[in-house]
Amino acid sequence: NIGILTYYRVANFGANLQAVSTYYYLKNNGYNFVYLYESDDTVKNFQKKQANEIQKEEHVHFVDTVIPNQSFVFNANDINRAINEYNLDAIIIGSDAVLQHHPIRARIKKGKRKPFYIEKMVSERIFPNCFWGCGISEKISMAMMSVSSQNSEYKYFGKKLSRKMSETLSRMK
């Protein structure tokens, strides 16, 4: 039994197609699985700004039609509950740009009305979060598949942060 933690119910063709191809691979190879979709009101509000509603609805309708096994989770506690509820043996994290981190220094932007402002960011784009495996039970095996840290400005990562990220990633098997 495998849980797939990814960000696929979005207006993004790549995320949709990765989720669907993973679905068919697991289904055709006899695995039992459930998609764990992490979302909260902050993410929903952010998504509304990113795509028009009709396009987003079509993307979500597409993946909901193809992928029947879905569980909505909002934090690590929900993921740990899903591990028990679905008797999961492992979790696959990914794919797509789920390993992002945008430190505050990278989010300082030149403003039009003010000299500068700090760009808001949803929690899923700041380390630590569940996509890095943070807060998920140590008892379960986890692996990452086709993940990226797209648009993360590494030059702003300090040594302590980089070390903590490395420790977190070492849990993956």
Model-derived features with residue positions:
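Glycine-rich phosphate/diphosphate-binding loops that line cofactor/substrate pockets in enzymes
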Residues: N1
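Aromatic- and Gly/Pro-rich donor/ligand-binding loops
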Residues: I4-F13, L17-L169
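A short beta-strand/loop micro-motif in the catalytic core of glycosyltransferases
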Residues: M172-K173
